[in-house]
Amino acid sequence: MKGFDPEFQDLDQYIRVITARIWEGRRIDDIRRYYSDPCTVETPSSVSTTVEEVVSGTRATLATFPDRRLLAEDIIVSGDEDGGFLSSHRLISPMTHLGDGEFGAPSGRKVHVRTIADCVCKDNRVVHEWLVRDEAAIARAIGIEPRALAQTWLDQSGGWDKPVAGPAPSGYRSHISSAAPARAYAGAIEDFAHGGNPAALAYDEAVHHIGPGGATCYGRDETAGFWRALFGTLRVKSFTVEHLALNSGGGRADRLALRWRAQTLHQGESPDAGRYGPATGRPVEIMGINHVELLHGKVLREWVLVDDVALWMQVLTARA
């Protein structure tokens, strides 16, 4: 771990420790210690570039959800100490909506929301981050439909205006695994995006899929239905695999992280269309991060982080 404090033995430990200190321990000022400045943080609906924006965003979230926890479900690692490591960190956050903020007046309701953060880490700091949080799960938990929340945010912001994120730091090269299981999975998702049959992927008969809004699918048919509905409504013009990593061993199933981006048109020509309302023809960008567990080449569990609220914001902008 060249350039990191001696206490950190590997990337997994580094991510767990700084998460515990900053967010679990409420040592918010430590963000300035463990994040570079500038540091680009991209979400499906926003791009920030300074460490102070990370600090202020964290404080705002805690004001709205003061009992928020960040419980690590998994960390899938790649990269090296020269070009930079990348941690793909899946978290589940139990929390209660107790304060005013971007989700409106406090409802007092309990929320469980999943997030995946892909962080480039170099010289003891997070230097670039891609983050997808399941905003639709928060909305539904507090009694708001994702479409309604999207409209509220559009009204407050004056419309959809996400800037283009800057490139990752010099010297960092996104990891694209050459392992056969990783390539097969990424290739299958890209094939789905272009109209292929999701049933062709080697899903286990009892696959467990968790998608946007915290929705759960069981089995091959329901899981394939999710992909058909998504890409049937948003017709893909281009699909890019941005990061692909496979971790094996440790007595566990193989674990895979895939970050992808699709440029689409909201056309809704499929019989499964309707997920985002009547077609508008509007260009819509999907920024997704998937985590997968595989055993003997079959997908046992699949987590798909896509921000439905950000997608609705793009669709509703067209209607406005």
Question: Where do the PLM segments sit?
Answer:
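C-terminal and inter-domain tail/linker signature
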Residues: 1-320
